[in-house]
Amino acid sequence: MGIIEFLLALAQDMALSAIPAVGFAMVFNVPHRALRWCALLGAIGHGSRMVMMTAGFNIEWSTFMASMLVGCIGIQWSRWYLAHPKVFTVAAVIPMFPGISAYTAMISAVKISHFGYSEPQMILLLSNFLKASSIVGALSIGLSIPGLWLYRKRPRV
């Protein structure tokens, strides 16, 4: 993949991830003045995850680092716009949730329940369930770490 194709794919990924970020921000009653920043932060988070995955990181570590980036930027923007960081960050990380692997794990569980136990279905269930759980854990931990670092009152040593 050449650099032009990569940049076009990155721009498409960022544009398409801004849409659900704005949608969920509207569901969460984010103020209208903050909607564009939620879209931008969702695009930055998903785009940075794509860049890291293209560089060779696996999806769990890429999601963890992208959610830490979203958390840091959200805290900075909350200071500038006098809003809570969750106004920007929660809707921005939702496009990174693992819908496909969670859905595949659920379908595998239904197939095991309906057709009976089979080893390939169980392997598919466990691998997708663990992948989805790891990504959700990476999102939640990565989103909370910047707040722990940046709002610390006591000295570190």
UniProtKB/Swiss-Prot annotation:
Q: Which Pfam families match?
A: ThrE_2
As for subcellular location, the record says: Cell inner membrane
Q: How does it sit in the membrane?
A: Multi-pass membrane protein
Keywords for this protein: Cell inner membrane, Cell membrane, Membrane, Transmembrane, Transmembrane helix, Transport
Q: Which GO terms describe its cellular component?
A: plasma membrane
List all membrane-crossing ranges: 8-28, 55-75, 87-107, 129-149
Q: Which GO terms describe its biological process?
A: succinate transport
The family database entries (InterPro entries) matched by this protein are listed as:
ThrE_2, ThrE_Dicarb/AminoAcid_Exp, YjjB
Cite the record's note on assembly. Answer: The transporter is composed of YjjB and YjjP.
What family does the database annotate? Belongs to the ThrE exporter (TC 2.A.79) family.
Q: What does this protein do?
A: Involved in succinate export with YjjP. Both proteins are required for export.
Q: Name the chain's protein.
A: Probable succinate transporter subunit YjjB
Organism (species): Enterobacter sp. (strain 638)
For this protein's source organism, the top of the classification is: Bacteria, Pseudomonadati, Pseudomonadota, Gammaproteobacteria, Enterobacterales
